[in-house]
Amino acid sequence: MVLLYTPPQKINKLQREMEVEILDLDYQGLGVAKIQGKTWFVENALPGEKVRIKIKEEKRQFGLATTKKILEASAQRQTPKCQYASRCGGCQNQHIPVEMQREAKQKALFRRLLKLQPEGIEFMPMIVGEAFGYRRRVRLSMLFDGKLKRLEIGFRQKNSAQIVHIEQCEVIEPALNKILSKLTALLSRFSQPKNLGHIELVAADNGVAMLLRYSGKLTENDRTLLLDFAVREELMLFLQDDEKTEQIYGQPPFYQLADNLQLQFDIRDFIQVNSLLNQRMITAALDWLDVQKQDHVLDLFCGMGNFTLPLSRRVKSAVGIEGISAMVEKAKANAERNQCQNVQFYRADLDQNFADEVWATEPFNKILLDPPRTGAAFALNALCRLKAEKILYVSCNPATLVRDAEILLNSDYRVKKVAMIDMFPHTGHLESITLFEKQS
């Protein structure tokens, strides 16, 4: 019998706990340290601080750790405004001044693009808004504690399934906090609170919409409690069981954009959660594309027309492409509602070959795309053949932005402008817009 030699596993010589100095801040709000030549990312640590860390995970090129004790605190460290910040899994970075958060995000974005294109990029001022009270949508988990006979409403604890019960959230709009503060008293009166799933609140421009998700069937008494609450608080009320979602009170929610545009949506639909920055982002996009009356513009991953309809007010024709059929129908309805007659919407899977689609052969001279976190690699490889003079890319993931930018650079496009958008202060999310121009 042949015995195979198995070398012993390499023993990690690093201590599980150690003292380190934090050298920098990454865009997700993690402190950066060097240990034995390797980069480590440390939770709850600021540049200039000395901290005792606990190793969480070590990988080949980097490691992850958490701060166990702050030995020397930075003068810039601040007390979180939110009383739940140390436990809630929502905002991770309230201990960091918002200006420092933004600078770290902007630096990371610019540095990544400079590696691809060292010259010729115009770095635009960051697009920012309010640091608190900016979210117009919130989703709340619910759990009934049978032993304590108590209903918990709030957010999942960080790295846990436990719920942090909250009465107020510092990053949501005031109109949502007004409703949030009354939910525990309302829902604790339900006959079967253990059947409650979650609640979504959305601050539309015509009032607050509320969705209650539950299993089983609501009793007439529980339904009456909800309806009375909706009438009293002037809510648009939606109920969702295991089979369907229905609106039982109020008008359909909508949000407004410039040029008297009004976009109607369902409470489950994706909309940008930061209303102010959504408008500023649209304004910047149209300005950078330098849209003119003779332009033919293609908008990919268009949703219900968030960019397409504002574009249609300024160009000869606009075409929006979306992968979800229901969103395409809502986009068409919004176009009709706003009397936008020079816009068309189509359903297409942009991760599949769309060369034979009727819209794919039109002579678009400008393109806008707002893809999901996975990016738009397949679509861009096909779109480069259209040879549009300008392409504006809205990104929510710097890694896929860089990957997709390389596709465009290899097709004779160059990065013209870029700006960081601080859509989600106190989180590690990095949004941006980048303008690419075709080289003549």
UniProtKB/Swiss-Prot annotation:
Catalytic activity, EC: 2.1.1.190
Active site as annotated: C396 (nucleophile)
Keyword match Magnesium: no
Catalytic activity, as annotated: uridine(1939) in 23S rRNA + S-adenosyl-L-methionine = 5-methyluridine(1939) in 23S rRNA + S-adenosyl-L-homocysteine + H(+)
Annotated NCBIfam families: PRK13168.1 (NF009639), rumA (TIGR00479)
Family: Belongs to the class I-like SAM-binding methyltransferase superfamily. RNA M5U methyltransferase family. RlmD subfamily.
UniProt protein name: 23S rRNA (uracil(1939)-C(5))-methyltransferase RlmD
Source organism of the structure: Mannheimia succiniciproducens (strain KCTC 0769BP / MBEL55E)
Lineage: Bacteria, Pseudomonadati, Pseudomonadota, Gammaproteobacteria, Pasteurellales
